[in-house]
Amino acid sequence: MDILCEENTSLSSTTNSLMQLHADTRLYSTDFNSGEGNTSNAFNWTVDSENRTNLSCEGCLSPPCFSLLHLQEKNWSALLTAVVIILTIAGNILVIMAVSLEKKLQNATNYFLMSLAIADMLLGFLVMPVSTLTILYGYRWPLPSKLCAVWIYLDVLFSTASIMHLCAISLDRYVAIQNPIHHSRFNSRTKAFLKIIAVWTISVGISMPIPVFGLQDDSKVFKEGSCLLADENFVLIGSFVAFFIPLTIMVITYFLTIKSLQKEATLCVSDPGTRTKLASFSFLPQSSLSSEKLFQRSIHREPGSYGRRTMQSISNEQKACKVLGIVFFLFVVMWCPFFITNIMAVICKESCNRDVIEALLNVFVWIGYLSSAVNPLVYTLFNKTYRSAFSRYIQCQYKENKKPLQLILVNTIPALAYKSSQLQMGPKKNSKKDDKTTDNDCTMVALGKEHPEDAPADSSNTVNEKVSCV
């Protein structure tokens, strides 16, 4: 009898447990599945409880429901990052196509911009998608551990290449302003590519220690299951070598370039001593040369206090510096928060809130990635050649419809009878016209200056200066 009573008691307790479990299940379904409003209230109440008591979520919100809500929040972040990835890849592909196909854009500075676009495009292809994947997995590394060091290496490589390209552009423009003749003589396409190779070599050298040491010791690239640089020495040294030092060089040379342009503009306005003699004219038949080389003129300048550059060429340089300055500014503004926070994470480990630092780094790194997507937008807004090329490429028109060449001469030579095929005019000996100079500002491309936007680029080392004196 005692045994039967114990069995009945056990069965009744089991029945009561099942009934209580059923009631709890119904309560759970009512609280979290009855509507959007109840879910929000339960979640807000949980957050308030955590803030008031600083306790875990046990008893107030079940872990499956919390994970579902948290995953939904991260999906919105992943959606935003997907938009950034698409803009980065598509925009930089357009930049690469424009420099490759448009002769007007084929000069040293735009070659650097094309190489920069390649780095940004590879960042969008190889680095950003993996970063989005880690967001979906709660910043845990979901791929094989050996790929972590490779991913960080590519991230550092392309980010370093971006700042190195901007630094090289700033240095190249400054040299072109300070010594235009020397820069024009030694600034060929081959030398521009050699400079680009040097930039990539430096970037590879800075980022190479990551896979070398990371593949040997996982602790240098893993921290609590997350794939990130855990070596504090490399974080400090890498931040200064890969960002702050090139940033300092870039900013100094850019402001020196602006100062030099302002100084030359002042000299050109105050001193009309740019004495330019028209030595010879040459009109060649269109069948023998391309339209870009149809009209050539040799120009000889007399030495004066200011004879290197005219107001139009200085104005073109200032426009180019304006566009580059916007690119520099956006890059600095978008990457500085990440690198400053990265340094703070190492320096103030004990005094700073670790969770806050990690959250800021996760946000700031994507703000830095965003700089790779905005460069094509800057080119589109401020450069009509890029804007026209992008518009045609989107419409699958890869060649520009060339308009027939119309040659107009205004007040440059006296009216003479000449053949339509060829006219040559040279200076006469002991003629007063030999001493006649052009004091007006003539629109010309000075030695060492990049081609303006609406002038076709010439790959030859000979400088054919265009003149339009009105």
UniProtKB/Swiss-Prot annotation:
Domain notes: The PDZ domain-binding motif is involved in the interaction with PATJ, CASK, APBA1, DLG1 and DLG4.
Function: G-protein coupled receptor for 5-hydroxytryptamine (serotonin). Also functions as a receptor for various drugs and psychoactive substances, including mescaline, psilocybin, 1-(2,5-dimethoxy-4-iodophenyl)-2-aminopropane (DOI) and lysergic acid diethylamide (LSD). Ligand binding causes a conformation change that triggers signaling via guanine nucleotide-binding proteins (G proteins) and modulates the activity of downstream effectors.
Binding site for serotonin: D155, N342
Pfam families: 7tm_1
Membrane topology: Multi-pass membrane protein
Record's protein name: 5-hydroxytryptamine receptor 2A
Motif DRY motif mapped to chain: 172-174
Annotated site (Hydrophobic barrier that decreases the speed of ligand binding and dissociation): L229
Side of membrane Cytoplasmic, spans: 98-111, 172-191, 259-321, 382-470
Extracellular side: 1-80, 138-146, 216-232, 348-355
UniProt-listed SUPFAM superfamilies: Family A G protein-coupled receptor-like
Activity regulation summary: G-protein coupled receptor activity is regulated by lipids: oleamide increases HTR2A-mediated activity.
Region span, Disordered: 424-470
Glycosylation sites: N38
Gene, per the UniProt record: HTR2A
CC terms in the record's Gene Ontology section: axon; caveola; cytoplasmic vesicle; dendrite; G protein-coupled serotonin receptor complex; plasma membrane; presynapse
